């Protein structure tokens, strides 16, 4: 057990004119939590694009001048539990989850996280990830790496369309992202979707073949639209897709969407989690997410297809699905790199680089 008075270090920022930094505060573990809360000693937290997107969009006049803490994914150990907390959450339990916030003083890139397990869902008990003897990462790293990305992918497949079959076909734009990694595993192993086509760079094709994609199309060898069209005609019997899922930001298919996406009446969807253009994470503005074209796609009653902006706050049951898939070995969270807490700047730079193949995780212990 830790000392009763501890120093809680967190990675924070104030607004989009201030850099991220480590801030420290004294925490009295005897009185820092309510009767319905637990204190989690955080072992690891994962970075996600939403972390520095919200940072760069944070105007102090709108969102205040208090410190805001990075990150949402976490893993750790419960070290304190209030008297009204459900007895399924006990001191010593290893847990992980997604702490949802936009500009919260509490975040997960911190040494101690205080939350209400009945409200701050999803939270779950950690499951062991099947590993071989050469695996360099422990269960805390893996446990922190998957909730938000897995949940976003699951929500996309679960929320918008309910009638997946072995005849269903999906096109994934951005096959190499962590969300798409989860998406293809869920699509093939949970929803039993028959055909998943991915778009990625030619250098990523061999890697992505192993993930479960049925076909892969390079975006850097000619026209994406023409290459997918050729695949559709030659291999897919010219069948259209039930869903086009965009995890990177793309608009190439909109002018010819009726050639690729099934009619609206057949419950087909175009779902994006990134907008119409690939984001420059070093220079983000509100226009990247609230463009006129996005608004028109969302509300235009005359468009011939269903367009949705996928959300990163998924249904609570995704966490149980993820646990089961991890235990069965049908999903293993992808890790790009792991950094110590004091290396948080390097971790952020790695994610901003757009070169990460998997999750960037920061360890506190």
Curated annotation (Swiss-Prot):
Name of the featured protein = Protein YIM1
Identify its protein family. Answer: Belongs to the YIM1 family.
Q: What is the lineage of its organism?
A: Eukaryota, Fungi, Dikarya, Ascomycota, Saccharomycotina
Q: Which GO cellular component does the record give, naming just one?
A: lipid droplet
Question: Localized where?
Answer: Lipid droplet; Mitochondrion
Q: Which InterPro entries match?
A: ADH-like_N, GroES-like_sf, NAD(P)-bd_dom_sf, YIM1/Zinc_Alcohol_DH_Fams
Q: Keywords on this record?
A: Lipid droplet, Mitochondrion
Gene3D superfamilies xref list: Medium-chain alcohol dehydrogenases, catalytic domain (3.90.180.10), NAD(P)-binding Rossmann-like Domain (3.40.50.720)
Q: Check the record and name the SUPFAM superfamilies matching this protein.
A: GroES-like, NAD(P)-binding Rossmann-fold domains
Q: Which organism is it from?
A: Saccharomyces cerevisiae (strain YJM789) (Baker's yeast)
Q: List the disulfide bonds.
A: none
